[in-house]
């Protein structure tokens, strides 16, 4: 919303997107409360990942969201395949489908931007696309949660850096759900 204030249609979509993303976290936390209460995040931990992002160019923000949704689609799909417990499998499968639908919506907004702005939009999308696609070479998964977003808070300005265990994501991907090169290539 911050970077697209002049686009009421996109802003309306972002409101729906935010609601659905909140739904994902609430469902996952409810699952933890029922089956792994020792892993439920505290209010302090939740508050730590809520901080302001610096303003960013609207087109790059759009592409970043698209890339994040594509990556999350695959992460959750892999988590659903990896787990054997039926409830969490279904939760991850449903979230994966939601993320794919979100990516589709972002893609439609990207196509609209290309129709309106042509080369300017293509250049902005290419810059972020190269950044997000390079994660296989860096050995670290690139997703908006581990990109620096607030100069005044650097280096503690990524969502991942504010987790109680900042190395959790890599461990989950590499050791638990085994998001390997085959899965990375799907992204």
Positions of the model-derived regions?
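Non-heme di-metal
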Residues: 1-187
């Amino acid at each position: 919303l911050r970077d697209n204030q002049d686009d009421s249609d996109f802003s309306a979509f972002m409101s729906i997107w935010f609601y659905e993303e909140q739904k994902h976290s609430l469902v996952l936390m409810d699952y933890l409360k029922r089956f792994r209460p020792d892993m439920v995040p505290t209010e302090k931990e939740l508050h730590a990942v809520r901080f302001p992002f610096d303003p960013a160019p609207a087109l790059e923000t759009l592409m970043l969201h698209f890339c994040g949704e594509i990556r999350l689609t695959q992460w959750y799909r892999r988590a659903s395949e990896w787990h054997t417990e039926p409830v969490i499998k279904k939760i991850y499968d449903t979230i994966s489908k939601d993320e794919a639908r979100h990516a589709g919506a972002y893609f439609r907004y990207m196509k609209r931007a290309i129709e309106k702005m042509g080369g300017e939009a293509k250049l902005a999308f290419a810059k972020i696309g190269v950044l997000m696609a390079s994660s296989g070479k860096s050995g670290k998964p690139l997703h908006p949660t581990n990109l620096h977003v607030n100069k005044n808070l650097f280096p503690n300005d990524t969502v991942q850096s504010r987790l109680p265990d900042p190395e959790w994501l890599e461990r989950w991907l590499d050791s638990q759900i085994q998001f390997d090169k085959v899965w990375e290539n799907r992204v």
